[in-house]
């Protein structure tokens, strides 16, 4: 619909002045100029621009933009205020007249030209051909723009000459059709609707381009400084969460991804997982527990990849098995209760060691405890079948029983006793209880750990092996817990990065397949650890199950429950050190003996700890 234009001319007050101003914004349909060719695209937007005026309008728009400060170093706030209050602009639909009136209001001289370089000529031009006419605009200096993808082509230096106004005009962004031509090369492309677009760019050498272009702000990103700011942002956000200052926490959590993008390697990944966990806590989008068959299968898959990618689980299994093997010395009937059997990866090595024992292997019974499956299948029984087949091949008398329990606190002593009546003439079973990364989950429910330790004490095991993360992620203070977990998982991710270069076994096998498999293992291991981070940071109450504690804290808990430490022998220490030589980055992994327990860490930071326990003397 065309708008009517009336020249009020006067400066009346009150409602008359407002009506006059509104009238000045109207345009008469008779002014369109019947018979004149008007650009259809601009006309559809409500602007009248004759095809013959396109180049002139473009140049005036550019001058207006520079005058308003958009292309210069800083905008003119006074001019913007002036435009918003006192100025009356006539007929904005007549784009040419409107731009001219805006320029006349400003009445600013053209921008000064920078001095010409002594021996270089920067002749730059760009032409975009469209359906409505030709625009002669300066080229875009920002050739890295993903929106416009303008790629300047370097031309050889020529004889010195004065710079034209076009060559030094502030750069403008320009959309091209993906084609570029120069004095030495040309190409063309066709876009939708049959409209062909082409661009011609003749760029000066870098020195000349720098001299010709106006000074633009340059942002130099200091990776180390950005890393410090990233850590400060993470800690400040955690402090805001603890103080329940959600507005500050929300503002900080939005900065974390931007700061993390400047980092590389382990720091970027750790920051991404902690940033996600903070965002979930701030916006109350807590992670849901694994409740479907797919979730359970995915958790098992992550556990398997973590086992393959780094030595932590292998170290846990090896040191626990060594303690159990020494406790079973000379016994003919042995029984192992595994509080978290998973895929049963720990037990083939122990079965093989027992099979090679002088005097022959003992009768081996295994009780595997695991959570119920969402589809109610007996996954524990499938693990038992595989272990039974392996035991048969190495000629070990093997019995297996699976116990499904939603939590270890549901176990009762009678469930762990031998089935049926024991033969009084036979040697009694020697029991070992094994827990790898399971005890800390009991701390989510008050009294659950004490209940389980009471059950263990009732079956009177000869040895109890416990492997836990060497960290304190169970503090009552959220900020303390967050800070400790940030340090812990940063070291854990560093160890994954350090061990990703390929160990001796991978190098000897050669080929791209082992490297690809190692890369997959590392990525899935990072997801495995990321889920722990999310639980530590984003969850509370019974949902927060990753309540890791230090070896000293476990020593107090087990000591109060009636257990005492069994010193792990020097043989376990030596063999564990030998095991680490098989892994890439083995020089970074450190095994330490601490008060009869063994810890595995990365450089100077212990990450997991293995301890062995027995019933204390009455």
Curated annotation (Swiss-Prot):
Modification note: Phosphorylated. Ubiquitinated. Upon GA application it is ubiquitinated, leading to its subsequent degradation.
DELLA motif (motif): residue ranges: 39-43
Effect of residue 46 to E: In sln1-d; dominant mutation that causes a dwarf phenotype probably due to its inability to be degraded
Motif LxCxE motif mapped to chain: 235-239
Biased segments, Gly residues type: 7-17
Leucine repeat II (LRII): region residues: 382-421
Any Gene Ontology biological process: gibberellic acid mediated signaling pathway
Ranges where the record places region SAW: 538-614
Region span, Leucine repeat I (LRI): 228-284
UniProt entry tagged with the keyword Lipid metabolism: no
Cystine pairs: none
Compositional bias segments (type: Low complexity): 119-128, 176-197
Gene3D superfamilies per record: Transcriptional regulator DELLA, N-terminal domain
Tissue-level expression: Apparently restricted to regions where growth is occurring in the leaf blade. Localizes almost exclusively to the basal elongation zone (EZ) for the elongating blades of L1, L2 and L3. More detailed fractionation of the L3 blade shows that in cv. Himalaya, it is preferentially localized to the basal third of the EZ, but its presence can still be detected toward the end of the EZ (at protein level).
Record carries keyword Magnesium: no
Region (PFYRE): 431-535
Keywords, comma-separated and alphabetical: Gibberellin signaling pathway, Nucleus, Phosphoprotein, Repressor, Transcription, Transcription regulation, Ubl conjugation
Chain segments carrying region Disordered: 1-36, 106-137, 159-197
GO CC terms, sorted: nucleus
Motif (VHIID): 334-338
Domain GRAS: 221-614
Task performed by this protein: Probable transcriptional regulator that acts as a repressor of the gibberellin (GA) signaling pathway. Probably acts by participating in large multiprotein complexes that repress transcription of GA-inducible genes. Upon GA application, it is degraded by the proteasome, allowing the GA signaling pathway. Acts as a negative regulator of GAMYB gene expression.
Family the entry assigns: Belongs to the GRAS family. DELLA subfamily.
PANTHER family referenced in this protein's UniProt entry, alphabetically: OSJNBA0084A10.13 PROTEIN-RELATED
The protein's name in its UniProt record: DELLA protein SLN1
High-level lineage: Eukaryota, Viridiplantae, Streptophyta, Embryophyta, Tracheophyta
Underlying gene: SLN1
């Amino acid at each position: 619909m065309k708008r009517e234009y009336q020249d009020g001319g006067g400066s009346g007050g009150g409602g008359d002045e407002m009506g006059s101003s509104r009238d000045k914004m109207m345009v008469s349909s008779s002014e369109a100029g019947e018979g004149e060719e008007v650009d259809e695209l601009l006309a559809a937007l409500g602007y009248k621009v004759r095809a013959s005026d396109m180049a002139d309008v473009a140049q005036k728009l550019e001058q207006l933009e520079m005058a308003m400060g958009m292309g210069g170093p800083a905008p003119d706030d006074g001019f913007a205020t002036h435009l918003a209050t006192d100025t009356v602009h006539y007929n904005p639909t007549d784009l040419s007249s409107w731009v001219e009136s805006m320029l006349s209001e400003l009445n600013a001289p053209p921008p000064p030209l920078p001095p010409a370089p002594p021996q270089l000529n920067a002749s730059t031009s760009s032409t975009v051909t469209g359906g409505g006419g030709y625009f002669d605009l300066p080229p875009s200096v920002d050739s890295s723009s993903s929106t416009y993808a303008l790629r300047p082509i370097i031309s050889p230096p020529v004889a010195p000459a004065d710079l034209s106004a076009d060559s030094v005009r502030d750069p403008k962004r320009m959309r091209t059709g993906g084609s570029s031509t120069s004095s030495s090369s040309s190409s063309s492309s066709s876009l939708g609707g049959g409209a062909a677009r082409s661009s011609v760019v003749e760029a000066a050498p870098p020195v000349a381009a720098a001299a010709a272009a106006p000074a633009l702000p340059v942002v130099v990103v200091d990776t180390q400084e950005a890393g410090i700011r990233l850590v400060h942002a993470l800690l400040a956000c955690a402090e805001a969460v603890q103080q329940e200052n959600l507005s500050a926490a929300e503002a900080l959590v939005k900065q974390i991804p931007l700061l993390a993008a400047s980092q590389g390697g382990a720091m970027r990944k750790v920051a991404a997982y902690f940033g996600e966990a903070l965002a979930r806590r701030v916006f109350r989008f807590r992670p849901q527990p694994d409740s479907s068959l797919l979730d359970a299968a995915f958790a098992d898959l992550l556990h398997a990849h973590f086992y393959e990618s780094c030595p932590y689980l292998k170290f846990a299994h090896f040191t626990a098995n060594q303690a159990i093997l020494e406790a079973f010395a000379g016994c003919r009937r042995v029984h192992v209760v595994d509080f978290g059997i998973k895929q049963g990866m720990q037990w083939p090595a122990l079965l093989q060691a027992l099979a090679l024992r002088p005097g022959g292997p003992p009768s081996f019974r295994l009780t595997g405890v695991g959570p119920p499956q969402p589809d109610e299948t007996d996954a524990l029984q499938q693990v038992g079948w595989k272990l039974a087949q392996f035991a048969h091949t190495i000629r070990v008398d093997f019995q297996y029983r699976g116990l499904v329990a939603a939590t270890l606190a549901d176990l009762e002593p009678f469930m762990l006793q031998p089935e049926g009546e024991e033969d009084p003439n036979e040697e009694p079973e020697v029991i070992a209880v094994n827990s790898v990364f399971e005890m800390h989950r009991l701390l989510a429910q008050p009294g659950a750990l004490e209940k389980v330790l009471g059950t263990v004490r009732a079956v009177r095991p000869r040895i109890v092996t416990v492997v836990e993360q060497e960290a304190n992620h169970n503090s009552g203070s959220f900020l303390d817990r967050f800070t400790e977990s940030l340090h812990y998982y940063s070291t854990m991710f560093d160890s994954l990065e350090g061990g990703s270069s390929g160990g001796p076994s991978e190098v000897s096998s050669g080929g791209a397949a082992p490297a690809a498999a190692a890369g997959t293992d590392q990525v899935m291991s990072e997801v495995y650890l990321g889920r722990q981070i999310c639980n530590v940071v984003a969850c509370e109450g019974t949902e927060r199950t990753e309540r890791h504690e230090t070896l000293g804290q476990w020593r107090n808990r087990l000591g109060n429950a009636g257990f005492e430490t069994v010193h792990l022998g020097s043989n376990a220490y030596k063999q564990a050190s030998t095991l680490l030589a098989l892994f890439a980055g083995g020089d970074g992994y450190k095994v330490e003996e601490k008060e009869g327990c063994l810890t595995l860490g990365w450089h100077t930071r212990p990450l997991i700890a293995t301890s062995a326990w027995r019933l204390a003397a009455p």
